[in-house]
Amino acid sequence: DSIALLDLISPYFKEIVCVYMYVVKDLSHINRYINYACNKYPNVKYIQIPHFSVYSFRRIGYLGCVENEKQKLYNMAQLTDIVREKYNVEWAFFGFKQSDSMNRRLMLRTYKLNGINEVQKKCYPLSEYRNKDVLEYISRKGLIKPESYDLKHQSSGTDITDINYLLFLRGKFPEDLKKVINEYPLVERKLFEYDHERAKAK
């Protein structure tokens, strides 16, 4: 969604601050998208911050990551406000779609044109798009294609609990998988259990 969103809004602003929220920092399969965007859109600046889920992961030592019981928790709105203040950003744009979930559909339909929250200065240009529409837009504009984990699974970001994502990394980006396991050691157990079940089924 971020690929289409950036292309849609880039002609209308002098400067765009793109925020990539990472679960594991500096993964090569993510960096290639960031590099692509920075080269294609001269008015874009990329910053990287931890995904809001990372703070709760650290609080409980999720999947073996370094635990910090005193870790402060943040949500999406709080992180948005932090970035806005630091980079002097007036309007925030998001790739949320009504088709993503019931909650998003209900939220987006309360806004002007189903996608403009004038009070909070937040905008959702993809509100009425479906996944199919986003992929058609990307194809029509000749943009970089999103990763596909396999024939049935489109990328949904770095979901370290998704076995399809982990298998994708193991097959195509083994160095990235090492970085994931280094941060979240128990991820390796998920792969071990998957391989064990496959071996038993043979």
Cite the ranges covered by each PLM segment.
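Nucleotide-activated chemistry modules centered on ATP-dependent adenylation/adenylyltransferase
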Residues: D1-K202
